[in-house]
Amino acid sequence: MTVVSPIRVLVVDDSAFARKVLRQVLSSAEGLEVVGVARDGLDALEKVAELSPDVLTLDLVMPGLDGLGVLRALASSAAAPRVVVVSSAGEESELAVAALQAGAVELVNKPTALATERLYELGGELVAKVRTAAGAVARAPPEPAPSPEATSAPVARAAAKSLVVVGTSTGGPQALTRLLSELPVDFPAPLALALHIPTGYTEAVARRLNAHCALEVFEAVDGLELRPGRVVLARSGQHLKLERHGPVTLARLDRQPLRTAHHPSVDVLFESAARSWGSDVVGLVLTGMGDDGVAGARAIREAGGTVLTESESSCVVYGMPRAVKEAGLATDSAPLEGMLALLRRHVR
């Protein structure tokens, strides 16, 4: 009988109460072992060297060396633990997204200081994300891209002949940063994105992607028009559906269907794209856990469209792309660094 070693976890938080609660929650989960706690960034780096944890749960706002400083210090080590950020939406959302772009694998939304007793409610989500992180592959964060140069005149754009829809989960902020930073300002198709991320963070994701991208990136609002030069990111907590009226395609936000495991759902976005754009849709499934996107990829293929998947070699978690590929729905696959060439081949 094979004995499976427990996942070794180090809890990092400057709040003694948070350290206590997170330790209790994680220690009570089967297959997890909390090997230590750290009160700040420097303490965390010392404990990482001493205890060799598999996963770090990381607070971001700490005295001295903060969470981003810890991530930067760990970035040079291939043996570094995987990081799950435990952060509050609102003022910390920008920091949390920066941490995901810098290599953190997962994000758990922590209650604000006024509701610390609700930390116990994080249990199931935190345990699941620690387990996901333990199986993730470390990928170097993308090189900081120069800020897109402002153009003195608007880019002349023809009406879109294709639509690109993208679905991703674990590792998604890193992957989207790398992909979008490579797209030229005259990329001919509008893009719609569905990213699994806790509620309250997509506005910050859109802002940070916009800073790295020659295209304009927006958090979806109901009625926003999709057009070439524009990237629309589904708002966390709601589905993004696409509605076409002749040459005009609009974003629609909706909680229905409620039965889906994720809001936004990649399947819901892809299925609406297949209905509205038919054979002119290119669906792209990037790194992520689970199988969200399989039903949507099937709808795109049945409509005559194209489905591309990220290769295992560049995925943080090869779950969603694998599920699509194993279902026989992938038209083609490529690592992230080859995805722009693949898009150019399939986008008109």
From Swiss-Prot:
InterPro entries reported in the protein's UniProt record: CheB-like, CheB_C, CheY-like_superfamily, Sig_transdc_resp-reg_Me-estase, Sig_transdc_resp-reg_receiver
Active site per database record: S169, H196, D292
Reactions catalysed, as given in the entry: [protein]-L-glutamate 5-O-methyl ester + H2O = L-glutamyl-[protein] + methanol + H(+); L-glutaminyl-[protein] + H2O = L-glutamyl-[protein] + NH4(+)
Major place of residence: cytoplasm
Residues annotated as domain CheB-type methylesterase: 157-348
The record's account of how the chain is modified after translation: Phosphorylated by CheA. Phosphorylation of the N-terminal regulatory domain activates the methylesterase activity.
Annotated Response regulatory domain residues: 8-125
Residue positions, PTM 4-aspartylphosphate: D59
Localization per record: Cytoplasm
Gene Ontology MF terms: phosphorelay response regulator activity; protein-glutamate methylesterase activity; protein-glutamine glutaminase activity
Cellular component GO terms, alphabetical: cytoplasm
Gene Ontology biological-process entries: chemotaxis
UniProt keyword terms in alphabetical order: Chemotaxis, Cytoplasm, Hydrolase, Phosphoprotein
EC number: 3.1.1.61, 3.5.1.44
HAMAP family reported for this sequence: CheB_chemtxs
Family: Belongs to the CheB family.
Domain notes: Contains a C-terminal catalytic domain, and an N-terminal region which modulates catalytic activity.
Protein purpose: Involved in chemotaxis. Part of a chemotaxis signal transduction system that modulates chemotaxis in response to various stimuli. Catalyzes the demethylation of specific methylglutamate residues introduced into the chemoreceptors (methyl-accepting chemotaxis proteins or MCP) by CheR. Also mediates the irreversible deamidation of specific glutamine residues to glutamic acid.
Name recorded for this polypeptide: Protein-glutamate methylesterase/protein-glutamine glutaminase 5
Species: Myxococcus xanthus (strain DK1622)
Gene behind the chain: cheB5
